UniProtKB/Swiss-Prot annotation:
Name of protein: Metalloprotease PmbA homolog
Function: Probable metalloprotease.
Provenance organism: Buchnera aphidicola subsp. Baizongia pistaciae (strain Bp)
Subcellular location: Cytoplasm
EC number per UniProt: 3.4.-.-
Gene Ontology MF, one: metallopeptidase activity
Family label: Belongs to the peptidase U62 family.
GO biological process: proteolysis
Keywords assigned: Cytoplasm, Hydrolase, Metalloprotease, Protease
Main subcellular location: cytoplasm
Ranges in a coiled coil: none
Gene name linked to the record: pmbA
């Protein structure tokens, strides 16, 4: 892991490269945007207490974008040498000459940029480690999983990953910034077997700070318990029933909403929510806030991929859709202003109407399906039609009765959004969208 002093030196060096390229652009009378990313990390995979693989990775990526007379050119390279930089710049100048003009292309408005407004979001935490320590963390997770129960019969692997990323950004409007982040994760996936039935499941922990990770023992134990709970699963009859999306997969439910309000889909008129701005999309008690400046946040950023300053905002307020997710280009296409979402979303918090945990939601549902894993990609953002394979548990009188698999759940997202009855307080913070478990009044289940 790189020391803080090394990171500071690296950041200063990258900013100098960015400034040099921007000066090249100015000398050629073009507007430019420059991004440099340097990544350094290690991935350790353990299987059945043996080292399966150790991968050290270190890479650079330089991207130069040039705008001239509404024409755009972009070239990337992994070589940061002086000669390569000039070759890349010459290439991008050639591309922009032959590009078709587009009145909507160009740098963001300067007043939207995070110039002199960048704050410390506590995203970098170095860790004094050696490879043997990383191996032991992964081994410990798997070891604890096997100790949990004799029915844990195999392992698909236990992993430890660490990554340091430094990102330098600059453009011709006077913005040059650089920051570094760390990311650590550990995971374990095991197979349980009993009476001829075998089931797999996994658990993981992820954090900016190594000290905030779950203990590897807990990761292993959780993976074992989850795999064991799926043994001797049954199929369901085809029916309509109430359902709960567990907090572990709740982000997958709301990521469909994020895609539907993405500016690219809006200006291309390829979203089922095309005419839904400032209308009721969710129940009137549901609010979605974007909080990009959370300390140590997994998706925290002071500025987006174009340098536009990020801001705390309500995406949905009391069920009403308040904004699209726009970058500069999509905003200009629909005569609006960038929302600072070039590159994605930044820490969504789903705020509901309940202080209940999962057990209380199960009692509220009484009878229905608890969904713990989703399979496949059967979602159309254009129509809202939704169909995915699912794994979970059948619930009767508020109590989990048995595991179920080989089922498909389906519906239309527009209706599913409005069918949300409650959202629990069991918030999963391991994703860019943080939500508790979601109770839906009904969903179509296809089984036998």
């Amino acid at each position: 892991m790189m020391k803080l002093s090394d990171i500071t030196t690296q950041e200063n060096d990258l900013k100098k490269i960015v400034e040099y390229i921007l000066n090249l652009a100015a000398n050629h009378s073009v507007f430019s945007e420059v991004v440099i990313e340097k990544n350094c990390g290690v991935d350790v995979l353990i299987r059945k207490n043996s080292v399966n693989s150790i991968e050290f990775n270190k890479n650079n990526i330089l991207t130069i974008t040039v705008y001239k007379n509404n024409r755009k050119g972009m070239v990337s390279s992994t070589d940061l040498s002086f000669k390569s930089i000039h070759n890349v710049f010459s290439s991008v100048m050639g591309i922009v000459f032959y590009s078709s003009p587009d009145e909507f292309s160009g740098l963001p408005d300067r007043k939207l940029l995070a110039i002199n407004k960048v704050k410390d979001l506590d995203l970098y935490h170095d860790w004094d480690w050696n490879i043997n320590h990383a191996i032991e963390i992964a081994k410990l997770s798997e070891r604890e999983a096997f100790k949990e129960d004799k029915r844990i019969i195999n392992s698909e692997g236990s992993c430890f990953n660490s990554l340091v990323r430094t990102r330098a950004f600059g453009n011709s409007l006077g913005m040059i910034e650089c920051y570094s982040t760390t990311l650590y994760s550990t995971s374990c996936c095991v197979i349980a077997g009993d009476n001829g039935d075998m089931q797999r499941d996994f658990s993981f922990s992820v954090s900016r700070d190594m000290n905030d990770l779950n203990l590897p023992e807990k990761v292993g134990q959780d993976s074992a318990k989850k795999a064991l709970s799926r043994l001797n699963s049954k199929k369901l009859l085809t029916m309509k029933t109430s359902a709960i999306f567990s907090s572990e997969i709740a982000f997958e439910f709301f990521i469909n909403f994020a895609k539907a309000i993405n500016g690219n889909n809006v200006y291309q008129k390829s979203t089922f929510l095309l005419h839904s701005l400032n209308t009721q999309v969710f129940p009137n008690w549901l609010t979605i806030e974007e909080r990009p400046h959370i300390k140590k946040g997994l998706s925290s950023k002071c500025f987006d991929a174009e340098g536009v300053m990020t801001k705390t905002k309500k995406i949905v307020n009391k069920g009403i859709l308040k904004t699209w997710l726009l970058d500069t280009y999509s905003a200009r296409k629909i005569n609006l202003v960038s929302t600072g979402n070039s590159g994605g979303i930044h820490n969504w918090l789903i705020l509901g109407n309940s202080n209940e945990g999962l057990q209380s939601l199960l009692k509220s549902m009484n009878t229905g399906l608890l969904i713990t894993e989703l399979l496949g990609q059967g979602v159309s953002i254009t129509t809202g039609n939704y169909s995915r394979g699912a794994v979970g548990f059948w619930v009767d009188q508020g109590v989990i009765k048995y595991p179920v698999n080989e089922i498909t759940i389906s519906g239309n997202l527009k209706n599913m959004f409005k069918d949300i009855v409650s959202i629990g307080n069991d918030i999963d913070k391991r994703h860019s969208i943080q939500s508790g478990s979601i109770l839906l009044s009904q969903i179509q289940v296809s089984g036998i």
